[in-house]
């Protein structure tokens, strides 16, 4: 007589799901711990990025303004602000791997000819817009802070970090908009 084995796997699965059969240690080791480790790695990466940013900002501030004062009338203000914006954009690319994220769009747009040009020009336009916004934000801050104590450099660095994080967030939102609404020019076939 042939035994019906259709429900054997289902019965075995239900048996393993019983509370007394679940091994909580294995659940933690196989599911929760890897996720926790990933979060810790990302947190360490962000801490390292912020530490580097604060260190570089302190060096920059001390070399340009040894007495701890920031002058809005300095002729070097514009070039320094532009250089800082470029450095922050590259720092975000280096630490958060935005470049690799953007390369996916570009590769896909060349593989599939029906995709929109926005996937190539979109990221470039986003970077330019973010660069201008960051520059305007820093100029606005420099107009408010005419003479500052050395401690104000920490506040300015914190504002720059918040803007940098916002830039990454805006990048992801713009990616979603480009994918869902297909802004841009159609590829002529």
Swiss-Prot record:
It is found in: Membrane. It is a multi-pass membrane protein. It comes from the Eukaryota. Pfam families: DUF999 (PF06198). The keyword Membrane applies. The chain crosses the membrane at residues 78-98, 120-140, 148-168. Belongs to the UPF0494 family. This is UPF0494 membrane protein C977.06. It comes from Schizosaccharomyces pombe (strain 972 / ATCC 24843) (Fission yeast).
């Amino acid at each position: 007589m042939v035994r019906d084995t259709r429900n054997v796997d289902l019965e075995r699965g239900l048996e393993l799901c019983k509370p007394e059969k679940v091994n909580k240690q294995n659940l933690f080791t196989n599911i929760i711990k890897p996720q926790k480790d990933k979060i810790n790695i990302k947190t360490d990466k962000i801490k390292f990025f912020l530490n580097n940013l604060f260190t570089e900002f302190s060096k920059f501030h001390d070399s340009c303004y040894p007495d701890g004062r920031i002058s809005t009338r300095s002729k070097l203000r514009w070039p320094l602000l532009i250089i800082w914006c470029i450095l922050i954009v590259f720092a975000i690319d280096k630490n958060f791997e935005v470049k690799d994220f953007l390369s996916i769009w570009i590769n896909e747009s060349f593989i599939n000819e029906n995709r929109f040009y926005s996937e190539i020009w979109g990221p470039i336009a986003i970077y330019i817009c973010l660069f201008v916004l960051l520059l305007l934000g820093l100029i606005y801050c420099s107009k408010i802070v005419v003479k500052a104590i050395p401690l104000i450099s920490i506040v300015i660095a914190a504002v720059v970090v918040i803007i940098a994080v916002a830039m990454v967030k805006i990048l992801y939102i713009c990616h979603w908009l480009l994918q869902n609404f297909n802004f841009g020019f159609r590829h002529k076939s």
